[in-house]
């Protein structure tokens, strides 16, 4: 007889680990299946840091979810003793009419979020590491900062295990089908049944959700670490903010203070400037010309940052055509399958609240959280 569960969760990265935690916290009998080992670096939930912010330039509709996610950061830290968020402040820099600045200001204004607007002179005075041009401004948000992806995943796995979830690593799902009043899931090792299936596939969405009708694009991204020219002191969190910086051509970069000691530098990356790939074909080698392009770009806006190149790492974005998430009951299987995917390079800060939403959907079929923006049916006929 197949082992039977209330819910099977496919994928135990950021979203899946949070889903396993929230489901098991509510008493559900949970099985989690993961292709790789725990807290791996093959997908989208690694790299030491991810930006978190509330003045959200992508759309004001995200703000209520961010406010809840911030509450859950604290709950996770209290429950596990792991640091998952460092809120040391952040700036959104660009021309006043740039998406980064204008969109952030729109969300801050609509939701009455604490913020300050800084002109170029004030940016340079407050943050001497930054060198904006005279026509650039910044929205400063005190509650912006970073989340630590590996710690976040480890914390949610810890909580799920503590609450009785059964987590199987290096056991990927090979296929699933509807079965009686639920689902049947196959792996190379076994066959399992459950009343509900949750699929959090990350970059494997095009392979695992072919019947969803969403044209996902998987994009290779590169993260870089540099030793600043004059050491990391000026780049410590008390001196140097997280930032998203949009230039006159609309190119965005994002970066972090130095958080891991004097020898590990500071991290920076381009936002959505990668090449299309698959999890099987991604080039995980970072080439000299890529490092040079990053250093050249940063030498204009943060001149002291690109001193000595230390290391680089790759990850993958799973993009939707409109760059908004997919979180919903599966339209083709609305009674038994919940999906959370297509986070388009800006999802990790939402991990705790997405876990809560997924648990709502899987156990009750609905959620009080505002997720209308994330219905996959909006994309069913969209071009990739």
UniProtKB/Swiss-Prot annotation:
Keywords: Cytoplasm, FAD, Flavoprotein, Oxidoreductase. One of its GO terms (cellular component) is cytoplasm. Catalyzes the oxidative demethylation of sarcosine. This is Monomeric sarcosine oxidase. The lineage of its organism: Bacteria, Bacillati, Actinomycetota, Actinomycetes, Kitasatosporales. The gene is soxA. Its EC number is 1.5.3.1. The keyword Zinc-finger does not apply. Monomer. It is found in: Cytoplasm.
């Amino acid at each position: 007889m197949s082992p039977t569960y209330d819910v099977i969760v496919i994928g135990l990265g950021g979203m899946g680990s949070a889903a396993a935690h929230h489901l098991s916290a509510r008493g559900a009998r949970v099985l989690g299946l993961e292709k790789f080992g725990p807290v791996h670096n093959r997908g989208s939930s690694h790299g030491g840091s991810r930006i978190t912010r509330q003045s959200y330039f992508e759309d004001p509709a995200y703000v209520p979810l961010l406010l809840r996610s911030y509450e859950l950061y604290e709950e996770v830290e209290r429950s596990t003793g792991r640091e998952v968020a460092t809120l040391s402040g952040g700036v959104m820099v660009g021309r006043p009419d740039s998406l980064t600045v204008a969109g952030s200001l729109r969300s801050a204004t609509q939701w009455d979020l604490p913020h300050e607007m800084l002109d170029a002179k004030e940016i340079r005075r407050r943050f001497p590491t930054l060198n904006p041009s005279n026509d650039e401004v910044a929205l400063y948000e005190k509650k912006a900062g970073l989340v630590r992806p590996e710690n976040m995943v480890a914390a949610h796995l810890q909580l799920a295990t503590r609450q009785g979830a059964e987590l199987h690593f290096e056991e990927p799902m090979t296929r699933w089908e509807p079965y009686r009043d639920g689902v049947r899931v196959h792996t190379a090792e076994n066959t399992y049944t459950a009343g509900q299936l949750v699929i959090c596939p990350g970059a494997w969405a095009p392979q695992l959700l072919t019947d969803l009708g969403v044209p996902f694009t998987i994009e290779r991204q590169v993260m870089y670490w540099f030793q600043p020219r004059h050491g990391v002191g000026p780049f410590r969190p008390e001196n140097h903010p997280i930032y998203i910086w949009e230039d006159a051509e609309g190119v965005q970069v994002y970066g972090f203070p130095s958080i891991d000691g004097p020898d590990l530098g500071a991290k920076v990356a381009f936002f959505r400037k990668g090449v299309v790939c698959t999890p099987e074909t991604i080039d995980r080698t970072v080439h000299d010309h890529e490092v040079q392009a990053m250093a050249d770009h940063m030498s204009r806006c943060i001149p002291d940052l690109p001193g000595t190149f230390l290391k680089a790492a790759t990850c993958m974005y799973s993009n939707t055509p409109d760059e908004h998430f997919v979180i919903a009951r599966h339209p083709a299987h609305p009674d038994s399958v919940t999906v959370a995917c297509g986070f388009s390079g800006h999802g990790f800060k939402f991990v705790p609240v997405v876990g809560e939403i997924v648990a709502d959907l899987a156990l009750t079929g609905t959620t009080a959280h505002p997720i209308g923006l994330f219905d996959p049916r909006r994309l069913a006929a969209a071009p990739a």
